[in-house]
Every structure is written in structure tokens, then in C-alpha cells.
Regions:
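Nucleotide-activated donor-binding/catalytic signature segment of Leloir-type glycosyltransferases, i.e.
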Residues: 244-266
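N-terminal subdomain of nucleotide-sugar transferases
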Residues: 1-45, 49, 55, 86
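Acidic anion/phosphate-binding donor-loop and adjacent secondary structure
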Residues: 183-200
Length: 267
């Protein structure tokens, strides 16, 4: 089958969406499918090796903020999108932003089957403005996503049952399929002795970008209230704009957290 995957984020593996998209593409190709990709450019000539590139959106004075948050949104290019879509049997679109919205309209015009995924919660958007707890704002974003993007698709991939429930409660009538994003085969259950310095500790591992919605701050703030606070050792694997803040919170703990972006083998 010829499949076109359209995703804004497809660069450094520093966020869950990028990791999920790359895993999807690699596994589809392993199963014999011909996969083309449309994403923000990285210098690769558009159309080479099935990779169609478009420019990133220029946020002007906010570019540094956007970069720190690991958010790269692609600028729609109708010519490139049509080239990437025209020979496909089905198109899978990851994000409900300008590139994805342009793509679903082109697919509707060209009568190409479309599947989508729900990887961006409205709270992920509103948190950048400190409004993640505003029901009115988040409800509006759910409606905006539905009207401008998801209404064009009959199928939505939901990574968790929680996401599926949220969509149903906000009026999404599509076929919602819950499929886990999965775990890299490198991570398998096994027992191994703890390093000596952690032998008597309750070790807690958190893996996520250092951003508000991942709630690492709440984890660190909660530890002093635990009965065994002096026995808890937290490992926070990732990167992001809140790293300095997490380190400041960690300094107050008896066992400061180990914070960084370790290689997969170490993780």
C-alpha cells in the first residue's frame, strides 16, 4: 500500500509525537508498505526518497520561545502537498494545525481516504498561555480542532482510552480507535541490581519533555509530603524549557533528582 504521512514535527527525537511518527513510518516500511512523508524541511530536497519538505512557520519574535518548547509548525505548501498526496492510497495526518488542515481539504478534493491521530490535547495549547485550567478555552479548542480538521476524517487514532472519552464528551462522532503508541522493543521487563548509591532508595523514573502539562513540578513538590521522602530518588529524563525550574525544586529535596537526556541504552 502507498501511504503518505503528514506531520509537522519530524526532527530531533525530543518529544513523544516525533518518536511515535518515526516508529510508525519505520514499522510500516518493514511491513512492505511504500511510505512518503510531508513535514517541515531539514535541508533534504523535496521529493527525494519519498520525503516532501515545506518551510516552517516563522513566528517572528516568538521563534526562540517556540524552539525552546520543541514545537515546529509547518507552513502549508499546496504544490508540495499535492505532490505527496496524489499517488497515495491513504493519507495519515498527525496534527490539526495549518499543514494538516490544508492536507485534509486537498484529500477531500482528490477523494483520498484520510486517517488522523489525536496527539495534541487542547490543554497542550492553552498551557502556553497559562490557561490550561480554563474550561471555556479548552472547549473552544476542541471545537476548533473538530471543525477545521477532524470533521474531514471518519477515523481517529487515540493513544489512550482517556483521550477517546474526552473526544466523545466533546461531540466527536468519528470512529475512535484506541491504540497505544507502544514501547520501543529495547525496553523489556528485567530485573537488575540497583547501583550501590540507590540500593536503599525507592527509584521513580519520569520520561517526558520539561513542560507544564507533564507535571514534573507537581511530582517534585509532592515528595516532601511522603512518609518515605528521604528514601525517594527521582530520575527525570528529557529536556525542555522548565529544566532550570525543576533543578531549583530538586535542590530542596534530601535526594535531588537526576535530570538529563540520557541515551536510550542508559535509559
Amino acid at each position: 500500500m502507498r501511504i503518505t504521512v503528514i506531520a509537522d514535527v519530524l526532527g530531533e527525537e525530543n518529544n513523544g509525537t516525533t518518536i511515535t511518527v518515526k516508529r510508525l513510518i519505520n514499522n510500516l516500511r518493514k511491513r512492505g508498505h511504500e511510505v512518503s512523508v510531508v513535514s517541515a524541511g531539514d535541508g533534504t530536497p523535496s521529493g527525494e526518497d519519498g520525503c516532501y519538505t515545506v518551510e516552517k512557520i516563522d513566528f517572528k519574535i516568538f521563534n526562540d520561545y517556540v524552539a525552546k518548547n520543541g514545537v515546529a509548525l509547518a507552513k502549508p505548501n499546496e504544490e508540495v502537498l499535492r505532490a505527496g498526496i496524489e499517488k497515495s492510497d491513504v493519507v495519515h495526518i498527525l496534527m490539526p494545525f495549518p499543514l494538516g488542515r490544508a492536507a485534509v481539504r486537498i484529500c477531500a478534493e482528490m477523494k483520498k481516504p484520510v486517517t488522523t491521530a489525536f496527539h495534541v490535547q487542547p490543554e497542550n495549547v492553552s498551557s502556553h498561555f497559562g490557561l490550561q485550567k480554563s474550561k471555556a478555552v479548552n472547549d473552544y479548542i476542541y471545537k476548533n480542532f473538530l471543525k477545521g480538521f477532524y470533521s474531514y476524517a471518519s477515523y481517529i487514532h487515540c493513544p489512550t482510552e482517556f483521550i477517546a472519552r474526552q473526544l466523545r464528551s466533546h461531540g466527536y462522532k468519528q470512529d475512535l480507535r484506541v491504540i497505544s503508541n507502544g514501547v520501543d522493543p529495547a525496553f523489556t521487563p528485567r530485573r537488575s541490581p540497583k547501583p550501590a548509591e540507590y540500593a536503599d532508595k525507592f527509584c521513580i523514573l519520569n520520561t517526558a519533555r520539561f513542560v507544564k502539562e507533564k507535571c514534573q513540578q507537581d511530582l517534585l513538590k509532592a515528595i516532601p509530603y511522603c512518609r518515605h521522602a528521604d528514601k525517594i530518588q527521582v530520575f527525570i529524563a528529557g529536556e525542555g524549557p522548565l529544566e532550570k525550574r525543576l533543578r531549583q525544586l530538586g535542590e530542596k529535596l534530601k535526594n535531588p533528582p537526576v535530570i538529563g537526556f540520557p541515551p536510550k541504552e542508559e535509559l
